[in-house]
């Protein structure tokens, strides 16, 4: 048991991705008027809550992880950290994160952190992941909470922009997760996890991917239509969304579904990273509907 093991069970890669989305939501709401104290509270607080959820997930999924090639060497599977200590660690991380958001940001930001945690640990990890093909859909809501937390840490309100972020990031999660399920198909089948490709086939999953990317593309444009983000953001969102859709369409002719799914997965990360950056820098200081640009 070492410090490295305690870091590993928090899934640092997932935390880093969530930090980017928290920052995107925060800077979108800040409109250039940045309170760095609140920013740090939002980033650190959300990171702690996400870390807590990941540790709990590691605890819950020990039996599943033993059956999957990519996870069978995880810290808890190997017994490098005891279950009791991991549960205590996860609890302390969660309390610290929610407490920081509540005291240094606002109660609304803390509330969304709690909602995301409950969905991820309670609904998804403990129940739906093992029992329902719809587990991915429910789990996507938890993955969409970080940008909402960042936004609400500034705005202290759940407005159209916050709703758009929630919908947008939830929709993004679906093709992203389905791509993983395709190129890790054998792992999911061995672990008896009822993801869409395993339960209904890869062709059906490809259709769902196309529909979710199309819906995601429309949702991303709403930040500019609603007067929250600018035309540069719009151009990047439209361009990357359409290319992601094109990549998904190419999946129907793919010779190797594993190779295609990996490429789709990688581009999904580029897409959401680019949009998080663009909403951070191309915000609208005064809210103007897109129709304003036409006159």
UniProtKB/Swiss-Prot annotation:
Subcellular location: Cell inner membrane
Name of one Pfam family that matches: UbiA
UniProt superkingdom: Bacteria
Tagged with keyword Transmembrane helix: yes
Pathway listed: Porphyrin-containing compound metabolism; heme O biosynthesis; heme O from protoheme: step 1/1
This enzyme's EC code(s): 2.5.1.141
Catalytic activity: heme b + (2E,6E)-farnesyl diphosphate + H2O = Fe(II)-heme o + diphosphate
Gene Ontology molecular-function annotations: protoheme IX farnesyltransferase activity
Transmembrane segments: 9-29, 36-56, 80-100, 108-128, 135-155, 163-183, 209-229, 230-250, 265-285
Topological relation to the membrane, as annotated: Multi-pass membrane protein
GO terms (BP aspect): heme O biosynthetic process
GO CC, any one term: plasma membrane
InterPro entries on file: Protohaem_IX_farnesylTrfase (IPR006369), UbiA_prenyltransferase (IPR000537), UbiA_prenylTrfase_CS (IPR030470), UbiA_sf (IPR044878)
Keyword entries, A-Z: Cell inner membrane, Cell membrane, Heme biosynthesis, Membrane, Transferase, Transmembrane, Transmembrane helix
UniProt record similarity statement: Belongs to the UbiA prenyltransferase family. Protoheme IX farnesyltransferase subfamily.
NCBIfam families cross-referenced by the UniProt entry: cyoE_ctaB, PRK04375.1-1
Something else known: Carbon 2 of the heme B porphyrin ring is defined according to the Fischer nomenclature.
UniProt function note: Converts heme B (protoheme IX) to heme O by substitution of the vinyl group on carbon 2 of heme B porphyrin ring with a hydroxyethyl farnesyl side group.
Record's protein name: Protoheme IX farnesyltransferase
Organism: Pseudomonas syringae pv. syringae (strain B728a)
């Amino acid at each position: 048991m070492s410090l490295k093991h305690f870091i590993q069970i928090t899934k640092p890669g997932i935390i880093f991705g969530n930090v980017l989305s928290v920052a995107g939501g925060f800077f979108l709401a800040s409109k250039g008027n940045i309170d760095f104290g609140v920013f740090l509270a939002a980033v650190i607080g959300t990171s702690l809550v996400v870390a807590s959820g990941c540790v709990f997930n590691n605890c819950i999924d020990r039996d599943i992880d033993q059956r999957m090639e990519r996870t069978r060497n995880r810290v808890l599977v190997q017994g490098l950290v005891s279950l009791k200590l991991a549960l205590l660690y996860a609890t302390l991380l969660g309390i610290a994160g929610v407490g920081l958001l509540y005291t240094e940001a606002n109660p609304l930001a803390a509330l969304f952190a709690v909602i995301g945690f409950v969905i991820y640990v309670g609904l998804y990890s403990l129940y739906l992941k093992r029992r329902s093909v719809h587990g991915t859909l429910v789990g996507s809501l938890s993955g969409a909470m970080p940008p909402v937390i960042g936004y609400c840490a500034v705005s202290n309100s759940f407005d159209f922009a916050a709703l758009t972020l929630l919908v947008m990031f939830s929709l993004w999660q679906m093709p992203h997760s389905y791509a993983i399920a395709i190129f890790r198909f054998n792992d999911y089948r061995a672990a008896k996890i009822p993801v869409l490709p395993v339960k209904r086939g890869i062709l059906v999953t490809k259709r769902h991917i196309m529909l979710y990317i199309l819906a995601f593309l429309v949702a991303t444009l709403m930040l500019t239509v609603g007067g929250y983000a600018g035309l540069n953001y719009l151009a990047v969102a439209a361009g990357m969304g359409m290319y992601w859709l094109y990549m998904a369409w190419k999946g129907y002719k793919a010779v190797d579904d594993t190779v295609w799914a990996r490429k789709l997965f990688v581009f999904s990360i580029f897409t959401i990273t680019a949009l998080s950056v663009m909403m951070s820098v191309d915000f609208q200081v005064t809210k103007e509907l897109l129709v304003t640009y036409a006159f």
